[in-house]
Amino acid sequence: MGELMAFLLPLIIVLMVKHSDSRTHSLRYFRLGVSDPIHGVPEFISVGYVDSHPITTYDSVTRQKEPRAPWMAENLAPDHWERYTQLLRGWQQMFKVELKRLQRHYNHSGSHTYQRMIGCELLEDGSTTGFLQYAYDGQDFLIFNKDTLSWLAVDNVAHTIKQAWEANQHELLYQKNWLEEECIAWLKRFLEYGKDTLQRTEPPLVRVNRKETFPGVTALFCKAHGFYPPEIYMTWMKNGEEIVQEIDYGDILPSGDGTYQAWASIELDPQSSNLYSCHVEHCGVHMVLQVPQESETIPLVMKAVSGSIVLVIVLAGVGVLVWRRRPREQNGAIYLPTPDR
């Protein structure tokens, strides 16, 4: 089980980070049911997150809800964990029944998955979002609209369930209240519990270097590491213009020390005199590394400290560093396949 969670948790983190806005805090619960699981895979798993931090886990092997963050264990009494353990044991059985029913409807056999995701987000301006959805075999199945108190069904099987669920007005109102009120209240409480971890800022250390990726092909790599929160924007510009279609991006990944790393690369045109610059934005600070045209080694390393850019090392050429504060405009909720309610 430990090996499986070691695989699942970073994967979910990567998915969340790729869609998150740095000004948003979120609480999400993911649940996964598996029919006919392979050896070592639990038939039911539940994981809770605040932002990209796992806070709770439950699985059908341990049959216990447990804290994944020390500040959760320190602030919630034993009866909390016991109460939600009992609820999740009920969810485990419910998932098993629902998955069997779906397999009958689809005439499926063998191993299949049923997923639930529920959560909420608190934006910097105080506004909130809430989301609840189900998936079958990794594909959207039912999506809740809390404003219209209705479910969006993706096929005829889902439509049958939609009709039954929408007939229960009390449950629809309960889900709406949980998303808009309870979830946000829990999120604010957890943010206070873990504020030293969740609300800190660690600026990125950014490097640019050249690398021969294939014989005769050279690329520029812009690498950022040691940053938190994990949301970061990186791009390359050629002669002052962004060239997204020419850029390769790496995923934003945990570094193992509570910080994150990411990279973006672009292939060099050896026949041109193009001027390349890497642009990195993190927590409102915008950094620019301009690459010296004749450099053959690592041209730049820099780090943002307390809202300003500090040149740490310059090798084989002089770089141009620019900084300014700029608000992020992108905004969006994260919809991933589950809550402990």
Swiss-Prot record:
Glycosylation sites: N107
Major subcellular site: membrane
Binding site for 5-(2-oxoethylideneamino)-6-(D-ribitylamino)uracil: R31, S46, K65, R116, Y174, Q175
UniProt record, GO biological process: antigen processing and presentation of exogenous antigen; antigen processing and presentation of peptide antigen via MHC class I; defense response to Gram-negative bacterium; defense response to Gram-positive bacterium; immune response; innate immune response; positive regulation of T cell mediated cytotoxicity directed against tumor cell target; T cell differentiation in thymus
Residues that, per the record, bind 5-(2-oxopropylideneamino)-6-(D-ribitylamino)uracil: R31, S46, K65, R116, Y174, Q175
Disulphide-bridged cysteine pairs: C120-C183, C222-C278
Signal peptide interval: 1-22
Residues the entry annotates as binding 7-hydroxy-6-methyl-8-(1-D-ribityl)lumazine: R31, S46, K65, R116, Y174, Q175
InterPro entries in the record: Ig-like_dom (IPR007110), Ig-like_dom_sf (IPR036179), Ig-like_fold (IPR013783), Ig/MHC_CS (IPR003006), Ig_C1-set (IPR003597), MHC_class-I_related (IPR050208), MHC_I-like_Ag-recog (IPR011161), MHC_I-like_Ag-recog_sf (IPR037055)
Residue sites binding pyridoxal per the record: K65
Membrane topology classification: Single-pass type I membrane protein
Function of the molecule: Antigen-presenting molecule specialized in displaying microbial pyrimidine-based metabolites to alpha-beta T cell receptors (TCR) on innate-type mucosal-associated invariant T (MAIT) cells. In complex with B2M preferentially presents riboflavin-derived metabolites to semi-invariant TRAV1.2 TCRs on MAIT cells, guiding immune surveillance of the microbial metabolome at mucosal epithelial barriers.
PANTHER family: MAJOR HISTOCOMPATIBILITY COMPLEX CLASS I-RELATED GENE PROTEIN, MHC CLASS I-RELATED
Family classification: Belongs to the MHC class I family.
Quaternary data: Heterotrimer that consists of MR1, B2M and a metabolite antigen. Major classes of metabolite ligands presented by MR1 include riboflavin-related antigens, pyrimidines and ribityl lumazines, nucleobase adducts and folate derivatives. Forms reversible covalent Schiff base complexes with microbial pyrimidine-based metabolite, which serves as a molecular switch triggering complete folding, stable association with B2M and translocation of the ternary complex from endoplasmic reticulum to the plasma membrane. Alternatively, forms non-Schiff base complexes with ribityl lumazines.
Protein name per UniProt: Major histocompatibility complex class I-related protein 1
Organism of origin: Homo sapiens (Human)
